[in-house]
Amino acid sequence: MNVRKDALKDLVTRFDNNITAYKDGKNAYNEHSCRIEYIDPFLQLLGWDVPNEAGLAPQYREVIAENYSNKTDRPDYSLTLRGVTKLFVEAKKPSVDIDTESAPAMQARKYGWNAKHKISILTNFEYFIIYDTTTVPKETDDCRVSRYRCYHYKDYIDKFDEIFHLVSKDSVYSGEFDKFFNDTFKGEGSQKQQVDNLFLNQINDWRVKLSNELYSKGNQYTSLEKLNDVVQEFINQIVFLRICEDRNLPLYHKLNETISDRDALHTKLEELFREADKRYNSGMFSGENIIFDLNNNVIVEMIEGLYYPQSPYMFNIIEPNMLGKIYELFLTEQLILLENGRMGLAKKKDCANRSVVTTPTEIVKYMVEKSLSNVCKGKSPAEICNLRIADIACGSGVYLEEAFQYLQAYCVEWYLTNEPDHLIEIGNGKYKLPLDEKKQILCSCIFGIDIDIHAVEVAKFSLLIKLIENETEPSVRDTTPILPELSSNILHGNALVGNQELAGKRYSTDTIISLVPYDWDEMPADGFDVILGNPPYVTTEDMHQLLSDAEFTIYKNKYKSSHKQFDKYFIFLERALQKVKNEGYVCYIVPNKFFKISAGAKLRGMLSNHLISLDDFGAAQLFEDKTIYSSIVLLQKRVQERFTYTNVDSANDLWLGKPTDSIELNNSSLNDLPWKLSPDFEFLATIKNIESVCVSLEKVAEIFNGIQTSAERPKPIYWFSGDEIINENDTTVTIQKGNKKYEIEKSILKPYFKPTKATEKGLTTYTKLSTDKRIIFPYDKSGHLISIERMQSDYPGAFAYLSDYYDRLVPKSVSSSGKRDVPNATADTWYQYGRTQALTAFINTPKLIVKVMAKDNPMYALDNEDMLIASGGTAGYCAVAKKNDSSYELEYIQAWLANSYTERIIQIVGSDFEGGFVSRGTFVLSSLPFVQLDFNDSKQKALYDRVVEASREVYSINDMLDQCPPKQIETTLVRQKDTLIKEIDGLVSRVYRLDF
């Protein structure tokens, strides 16, 4: 740092010696000279590679500087995170007083705001000013509005550490920049509105106003579907023309010129559309024209809203991928007719109950590079045009845009090496392909499918905007039409349902319309080289609500991965593998829970031999305002032998290729069981070493869930706590429920383990269990429901109590007023539990009670009292008992489960929950590895015997502690118990290491 400060001191001294001349407006000292002599070196002292000494490809350069001589309406410097722009620097000559003038500040703020950056820098070297660009720039703002920091050159050395922390390359590349400014510039309100939210709100406002105007005309506009179509089309047309204007592309005349004469507005606008259709010819302007059905005020308001001072938009700064993300949110809503007869917006059915998330740019770029680099390597541009890249749930086309950009960049690099004269220079060492070649790549290589027709139109629109990026009027002069027609590339349909799935079946027209079956014959016959994207995440429960029975049935019948409570992304993964070529790749970002959950078994089995790499974000969060535990899966249709597993903390680290916890493993280690994946290679080696002597725990132990009464809320019916017992004798218990007393027979009661008080919680494995709760158990020793007749004769008190709660207990299948879901219930069995699995397991069966959700205190506690337990999903308990023919005592199984090695496996294969909690339900427990001992080996037998013996010593100590001994004895007993538990853990750990 001192070396940097010394160099900065030289810069400051030289500037100070010449400042009078520099600030003289008559002097020839200009911005060009200031950049070369002062601003470039200053940025380099902040770590930024301004001259690209690293020799990075144009798309990955740290600093993109605009030509000094070719001044455009672009920021002078773009500082990037491996090509992803993070902030702009706007330079001025020293004679421009940026400390007091408003125009330079407005320029810097508008640049940053339109790019959705947190900050922008404005400097003439005399001052280095940082602006907060999360606030909307207003025409009336002076230079002090949103000024976050202002440094004078004489303060640079003293303040260098602070400046370095804020805007250095190290800060940006470490992730500190994002973290600091995300925390610093929090807040909401009209002034804090960022470009995407403001533009989205604006176009949604247009949708409503346009639709109300058209709906009032009647005729064809009374159809909501029609309205949605024509309104979106008109908005796209207006926005496209405005973008072309800011990018200096040819137009018949400017959009705002059409509103100068209100009387001629409709004619001029229609003329502009017609000429745009001739020149661009993408189909965007060839549809129905609604101009003459709109009044002047609506059109004028729209057009004025796209120009300063009404709005601060700069469409040459707003990136195409940001427009795509804005439209992604636009697509979540549709026009509806409100009760008051006016048009409004409402969430589409498939978006109503879930948040729509947009994938971070770094992740999109990483996935595109990771998958496309495999198929592009070594190819010429002519061969590149033979590639077929698809997103089969493309939405707004974010992944397709990035894939198109990657292919362009690859071809530019190839030409720079092999045929540089083929390229067109666009300034400062940057080059582009001729427009015709870009069109060829787009039309030959990029394909998309989406079930939402409006998403299809947005994806086409986004790709066309991407196509004209870096184009100017001279570069398109000789190209007619400028744009291609993409109707053969981006298609409407359900990628999961083809016409062949409907063959031979009779569906109503409405069902077929809702299914939107896709004709795969419209796509390349031999499949795709790459399918990539972020497929829909929709749970089975949500699918039942959102989809027709016909559609859900097709998914269940067609896709092997539609197992148990599957998610929709399961079948997208399966479909993608089906639709790539034999050497093709699939790259998806999906929730990582499929590694572990029971429903993911079929999918795991399907993917295990095709996995190339797995980037696991664990509990790290990638999406704003949405908790999703994510992973990036790269597959190849060809069978793989090895794959790379990477544990990642942030999108930045992945995109930058920073060293991460990464290991290479055999695909043969994966199957349909939960995947045991960890960055701890040594631990995985230990697990691999015991595979040959392991069986799953379910082979040596019974593993079962607790009961489910389905009568817990608002207050439990079947069970009661000690606080509710008002009297007890040898045969009955009297309880107070509400205002009534009930005398219930003890012979129908069982102890019930359900910790509800603070004193009952925090239990661990070797805690002695007790409970003051009891539950009515209306079943015999064989697990059969006790009949009504016997209930009335043998347990009249219990039956009278249950009868008083008949309205709460009666199943839905018995009475229309019923509230409980009870399978197979009848009028004679109305009092049975909601679920009846494993009832006999609670009769005369010692067991371990397992707390399903645990963090630092897993519990596998021994119960010899036949306690019933509650099965409450992740919030409840399950149980483990000894199999009748097992050689292993329950004490040894308990020690195995409580062992630190076992816990590490559970941390890997159990489902993660917020706060570091991990679930260990019956599915996870059943699949745990269990090393089988050789009881003929004296060392192994001795180790086993000692584990059982030490465990029983712990139980004896628990009994003694139950007697509340004096403190001195208690301290000694607790210490002895802890010593025994450590000994038990050490002995079982030796088994894991096969160290007998």
What is each PLM-predicted segment?
Residues 1-119, 127-165, 175-182:
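A short, conserved, highly charged catalytic patch centered on acidic carboxylates
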Residues 2-25, 93, 163-408, 445-455, ...:
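Preference for the N-terminal adenyl/adenosyl cofactor-binding alpha/beta module
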Residues 28, 34, 51-53, 57-66, ...:
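SAM-dependent methyltransferase catalytic region
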Residues 39-44, 105-124, 431-432, 462-469, ...:
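Metal-dependent nuclease catalytic cores in nucleic-acid-processing enzymes
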Residues 93, 100, 119, 570, ...:
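Polybasic, glycine- and aromatic-enriched phosphate-binding surface used to engage nucleic acids
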Residues 112-201, 646-680, 686:
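Mixed-charge intrinsically disordered linker/loop segments at interdomain junctions
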Residues 272-274, 278-279, 283, 462, ...:
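Polynucleotide-recognition surfaces of large bacterial nucleic-acid defense/processing enzymes
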Residues 394, 532, 672, 676-678, ...:
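Non-catalytic DNA-recognition/assembly elements of restriction-modification systems
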